[in-house]
A protein has these predicted regions:
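Charged/polar, low-hydrophobicity segments characteristic of intrinsically disordered regions
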Residues: 148-150, 196-209
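Non-transmembrane alpha-helical segments in soluble domains
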Residues: 76, 80, 100-103, 143, ...
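Short, hydrophobic secondary-structure boundary micro-motifs
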Residues: 86-91, 155-158, 184, 203-208
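GST-like domain detector, emphasizing the conserved glutathione-binding G-site
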Residues: 1-129
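GST-like fold's C-terminal all-alpha helical module
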Residues: 106-194
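Residue-level recognition of oxygen-bearing side chains
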Residues: 74, 188, 201
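Acidic-histidine catalytic/liganding microenvironments
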Residues: 29, 186, 199-200
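Short polybasic/polar patches that bind polyanions
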Residues: 27, 176, 198
């Protein structure tokens, strides 16, 4: 029988921005003694990880009773409530709607840039110029929009919600893609990102190439 008081197991990789969201929540909430982090071997034929999570995706959280939670939003929500003092949960009402709206917008940026980066890692003859062009254009539109949205009160403070956490994770994907030049012409977004970038939770979870 599993001990309900034993740590939950969080399966991650050190490259996934989605896993990074969960890793940041663990550090921000000081849950290190409640969460065992395990490096998963993904995108490998017959990886033992597929017996744990058939989809092979991260993050994946295994609860003491064996329940499996997948998808970063669900995993982060569970972790946020693990100490019974949720910090990242959107509030009720109009303010909560704003948080969810901006989180969705930040997630669109992160997902698109992630696809763009994956194309760059493919062999040259397997890359899709159409996908690269599409995701690059999407990123340009979203970054232009974020230059004004970053002034929204929801985006102020120090990683107080998932909209902020998701956006900075997306912006810091710049280190993997030299063509993701979002800093050019977006001074408010640059100031916002640079102000938060020295937080311990971000420094300790910098993706490892």
């Amino acid at each position: 029988m599993n001990d309900i008081n034993s740590p939950v197991r969080l399966y991650i990789t050190l490259t996934s921005p989605y896993a990074r969201l969960a890793r940041i929540v663990v550090l921000e909430k000081e849950l290190e003694d409640k969460v065992e982090q395990v490096i998963a071997k993904t995108r490998q034929v017959d990886s033992p990880y597929y017996q744990i999570n058939p989809s092979g995706r991260v993050p994946c959280l295994i609860l003491p009773d064996g329940t499996r939670l997948e998808e970063s939003q669900l995993v982060c929500s569970y972790l946020d409530h693990l100490d019974s003092t949720p910090r990242f949960e959107p509030p009720a009402g109009t303010l909560g709607l704003q948080v969810r709206r901006l989180e969705a917008m930040a997630r669109s940026l992160m997902e698109g840039v992630s696809v763009w980066i994956r194309e760059g890692f493919r062999p040259v003859d397997e890359r899709s110029p159409g996908i690269v062009s599409h995701e690059q254009a999407r990123a340009v539109r979203l970054i232009d929009d974020w230059e004004s949205e970053i002034m929204n009160s929801v985006m102020q403070g120090n990683l107080n919600n998932m909209a902020q956490l998701t956006l900075i994770t997306a912006l810091q994907l710049e280190q993997w893609n030299p063509d993701f030049r979002w800093r050019e012409g977006h001074p408010r977004l640059v100031e916002w990102c640079d102000r938060l970038s020295d937080r311990a939770s971000l420094l300790k979870t910098v993706p490892v190439l």
